[in-house]
Amino acid sequence: MVNMEASMFLTFAGLVLLFVVCYASESEEKEFPKEMLSSIFAVDNDFKQEERDCAGYMRECKEKLCCSGYVCSSRWKWCVLPAPWRR
């Protein structure tokens, strides 16, 4: 009888401890995604995309010419890498 009571008490104490640990880690995890997203999407003047006179890879080439190293696909009207079968 005593072993059963002790094992029930230890099981209950283990569940309470597990609940406390999970709650603490969850409250820390709630702040982590916010911090991560704010650092990823932070606006920095050095990394802003600047306007170019040419279109880059997989950009429309109807109005703009493709940048050097790319050709305008006659089928899709996108700037793509030149390949032997596209020349």
UniProtKB/Swiss-Prot annotation:
Coiled-coil stretches noted in the UniProt entry, renumbered to this chain: none
- Key words of the record: Disulfide bond, Ion channel impairing toxin, Knottin, Secreted, Signal, Toxin
The family database entries (InterPro entries) matched by this protein are listed as: Huwentoxin-1 (IPR011696), Huwentoxin_CS1 (IPR013140)
Which cysteines pair up through disulfides? They are C54-C67, C61-C72, C66-C79
PROSITE patterns noted in UniProt: HWTX_1
Identify a single GO molecular function assigned to this protein. toxin activity
Q: What tissue specificity is annotated for this entry?
A: Expressed by the venom gland.
* Signal peptide start and end residues: 1-24
Positions of the propeptide segment: 25-52
What does the entry list under GO cellular component?
extracellular region
Where is this protein localized, as stated in its record? Secreted
What UniProt notes about the protein's domains is:
The presence of a 'disulfide through disulfide knot' structurally defines this protein as a knottin.
Q: What does this protein do?
A: Ion channel inhibitor.
Question: What is stated as this protein's family in its record?
Answer: Belongs to the neurotoxin 10 (Hwtx-1) family. 51 (Hntx-8) subfamily. Hntx-8 sub-subfamily.
What name does the UniProt record give this protein? U3-theraphotoxin-Hhn1a 10
